[in-house]
Amino acid sequence: MLLLAAAGWWVDAPYVLAVPVAALLAYWAFARLDLYMGVVLALVPLSINLGELGLTSVGWYMPTEPMLFALLLLSCARWLSGKRLDRTLWKHPVTWVILAGFVWMGLTILPSSHPVVSLKAWISRAWFMVAFYFLLAAWFEHSPKAQTRFLALLLVPICVVVTYTIVRHAGHGFGKGAGHWVMKPFFKDHTSYGAVLAMLLPPAIAMVWRKHKTALARVLWGLGVVWLSVGTVLSYTRAAWVSLAAVGALWAVMKLGVRLKPLLAASVVALGGLALSWDALVVQLERNNQDSSDNFTQHIESISNVSTDDSNLERLNRWSCALAMFEERPFWGWGPGTYQFEYAPFQTSTLRTRISTNNADLGNAHSEYLGPLAEQGILGLLAVLGLLAATLH
């Protein structure tokens, strides 16, 4: 392999350098799946969508999605040859909910408004499910240190992306406008970037305080926490900030010893009170005219502005479209991955904003619940809620 790499460098053919790397990855996929998965995890934050850069018509994130697709084919071949996963994993409620949701997602391809798009979304879901649920679960079960390695393999490249983003952002004075795109090409926009940072921050904090850690390990994890925190703040992603506040509140409730059933009961009561006072709440929200801003205090205040803030109003527009789409196709939905192609006719003039579009190029329903409801019908929503319930239980 070293000779092949040297030959590629000598004849000025850089693509030849990839051959020994591909050969090594292929060997690991068959003989050392843990090393192969480690490479995939480390490359996830660094992957680039070549389609968005105009370099290819295929909208895959390179190089991870081709690697995941290869892993899907290899795993299917292994299972067909008789190799089975651990029975305890198959019997786990989360596994059953995930598989039920996956089967239903496949069935909704048949009446989809865009069958090819839905089929691609379903196959994509398959390789994520196989790699990041079944194979990771098996890795975690057989290796006591796998969880720590998993987080470290994600945290290090994420910190590289945060550094890249902050350096670019600094060149634009850390303004809110630039904060929406300086993370490209690694992330599509600031919302996905902020969401990933927010999801990694709590487990990274937990690793700092985990027992039996050396002083050096605590310092390194602590530096990672600081860098993730800086990146989250500078992402100007209000949803990430609110989510972290909610996670902190939930952690405090758990530390106080409150069990799940009383917590769910309190949530139901709170939702009931919200429904009864909805009109008064809307009146109060409409009095908030603070738009999103470079000022962090004003940016936080703008979270509840549903009268003038385009970002918040567009979110309401997307939710309204998702509900209208569900009303038209309540059982089957419009098909996986089709929301962005179908929602435009469901927009109303009262909810359209300056950033609304009919071009099917600006994202999804902005809801992990309403999106499946519109695309996969009522059973799609129940699959998401079932996964949430099984995970919490």
Predicted regions and their residues:
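Juxtamembrane membrane-water interface segments that cap and precede transmembrane helices
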Residues: 48-55, 111, 174-186, 355-370
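Membrane-interfacial loop-to-transmembrane-helix junctions in polytopic alpha-helical membrane proteins
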Residues: 10-16, 56, 60, 86, ...
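Long extracytoplasmic/lumenal interhelical loops at the membrane interface
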Residues: 305-320, 328, 332-376
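Membrane-interface micro-motifs in multi-pass membrane enzymes
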Residues: 11-15, 57-67, 120-126, 185-199, ...
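Short, aromatic-rich membrane-interface segments at the entry and exit
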Residues: 10-20, 34-39, 59-64, 217-218, ...
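Flexible juxtamembrane loops connecting transmembrane helices in multi-pass membrane enzymes
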Residues: 177-186, 276-321, 327, 356-360
